[in-house]
Amino acid sequence: MTQTLADMRRDYTRDGLSEAQAPLDPFTLFRQWFDDAVKTEQLPVEPNAMTLATVDEDGRPHCRVLLLKGLDERGFTFFSNYESAKGRQLAARPYAAMTFFWPSLERQVRIEGRVERVTPAESDGYFQVRPLGSRIGAWASPQSRVIRDRAELENLLAETEKRFLNQAPHCPPHWGGYRLLPERIEFWQGRPSRLHDRLDYRLQGEAWIRQRLAP
């Protein structure tokens, strides 16, 4: 390494985030920021990529990067194998946090809340628009389980391809969607000298309360 980790930094230069700019509804602000990210972030960056954090039965946190696949007034939707590590963790402790980071915009959004499964119809609706290879892969992969080697996975894939040679794969019972129902959403805008803007929305009853946090 030619540069030490302690020396790796850059200053943020974009405009700030004021209460006057921010709508009272955090979903409105998220959509605005997400639309900005779609227009600004350059490929191969995926603006809908997020880090999802869950907690296991022992209280140990786990995180991984997933893709956001749905957003409405209820919450934020993603899909996974229900029998995966994250699926088992969400079954035991149905709460999670997700973080979006858009470096070109110097923005971050943190979301926390309860997680529930979407309806089977919603899961099937999304499953049917996935590429064929992804649909077959959802049947073939025993996600998060130990396998012997890559060859074992490829053998499982070959067997699954034969199974669905003359029929379209339907949504597996062990696969589907989750919706995070937000209780807190924090918007972070990078500012010079690390004096960042942080607007924090918290759900109280049916109303969102907005407050500013110190950086």
Swiss-Prot record:
Family assignment from sequence similarity: Belongs to the pyridoxamine 5'-phosphate oxidase family.
Keywords, comma-separated and alphabetical: Flavoprotein, FMN, Oxidoreductase, Pyridoxine biosynthesis
Keyword Methyltransferase among record annotations: no
Cofactor(s), names only, from the UniProt record: FMN
Protein residues bound to substrate: R9, R10, D11, Y12, K69, Y126, R130, S134, R194, L195, H196
Catalytic activity from the UniProt record: pyridoxamine 5'-phosphate + O2 + H2O = pyridoxal 5'-phosphate + H2O2 + NH4(+); pyridoxine 5'-phosphate + O2 = pyridoxal 5'-phosphate + H2O2
Pathway listed: Cofactor metabolism; pyridoxal 5'-phosphate salvage; pyridoxal 5'-phosphate from pyridoxamine 5'-phosphate: step 1/1; Cofactor metabolism; pyridoxal 5'-phosphate salvage; pyridoxal 5'-phosphate from pyridoxine 5'-phosphate: step 1/1
The protein's name: Pyridoxine/pyridoxamine 5'-phosphate oxidase
Function: Catalyzes the oxidation of either pyridoxine 5'-phosphate (PNP) or pyridoxamine 5'-phosphate (PMP) into pyridoxal 5'-phosphate (PLP).
Signal peptide residues on this chain, from the entry's feature table: none
Subunit structure: Homodimer.
Textual note on the cofactor: Binds 1 FMN per subunit.
Gene Ontology biological process terms in this record: pyridoxine biosynthetic process
Gene3D superfamilies in alphabetical order: Electron Transport, Fmn-binding Protein, Chain A
Coiled coil residues, start to end: none
EC number: 1.4.3.5
Binding site for FMN: R64, V65, L66, L67, L68, K69, F79, S80, K86, Q108, Q143, S144, W188, R198
GO terms for MF: FMN binding; pyridoxamine phosphate oxidase activity
